[in-house]
């Protein structure tokens, strides 16, 4: 089982639930997870992702950081072997991005993610060991984070220079 964190942050259905606790509980209930187990799962996830204080709030009342954290908590609710995340810190400022990344990478699950945030991949506390750079649907680099950032920076610069030359 793989948990998925969508770029849109949280599924639209979560906005229909009366609270974010209910939004996480409904899929668990649908899969016949016993009540006591559901409450333990939700309690643990909400504590880890600092969502306990807003558990009774509707998703629409959450700020962007809390919506990102909720998306990760939702992806983990069925205890997947790994998490696949598309831009898990997209649209967040540096402080919120760091909090979301810390929560994501500290949950003891393998994380595969797409990002344009080069600062994120080189932070030693996240222990990212391998980075793939994809360009035009092809892997063009496979290696260590620092080297990936250098490669990506050069790639973007060369594309910018080529585009600038095309306009001249």
PLM feature segments, named:
Residues 103-117:
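Conserved catalytic loops of ABC-family nucleotide-binding domains
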Residues 138-161:
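Conserved beta-strand-loop-alpha-helix hinge in the C-terminal portion
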Residues 8, 16-30:
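Q-loop/switch helix immediately C-terminal to the Walker
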Residues 83-87:
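Catalytic Walker B motif of ABC-type/P-loop ATPase nucleotide-binding domains
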Residues 37-54:
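Conserved ABC ATPase "signature" region
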Residues 58-62:
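Conserved ABC ATPase signature
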Residues 72, 100:
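Hydrophobic anchor residue at the start of the ABC signature
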């Amino acid at each position: 089982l793989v948990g998925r964190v969508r770029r849109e942050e949280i599924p639209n259905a979560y906005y229909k639930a009366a609270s974010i606790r209910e939004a996480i509980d409904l899929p668990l209930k649908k899969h016949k997870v016993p009540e006591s187990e559901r409450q333990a799962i939700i309690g643990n996830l909400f504590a880890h992702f600092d969502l306990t204080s807003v558990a009774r709030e509707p998703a629409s009342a959450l700020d962007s950081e809390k919506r990102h954290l909720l998306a990760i908590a939702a992806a983990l609710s069925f205890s997947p072997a790994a998490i696949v995340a598309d831009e898990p810190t997209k649209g967040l400022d540096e402080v919120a991005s760091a909090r979301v990344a810390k929560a994501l990478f500290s949950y003891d699950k393998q994380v595969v993610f797409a990002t344009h945030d080069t600062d994120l991949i080189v932070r030693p506390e996240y222990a990212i060991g391998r980075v793939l750079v994809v360009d035009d649907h092809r892997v063009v680099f496979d290696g260590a984070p620092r080297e990936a950032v250098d490669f990506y920076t050069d790639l973007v610069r060369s594309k910018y220079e080529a585009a600038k030359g095309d306009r001249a």
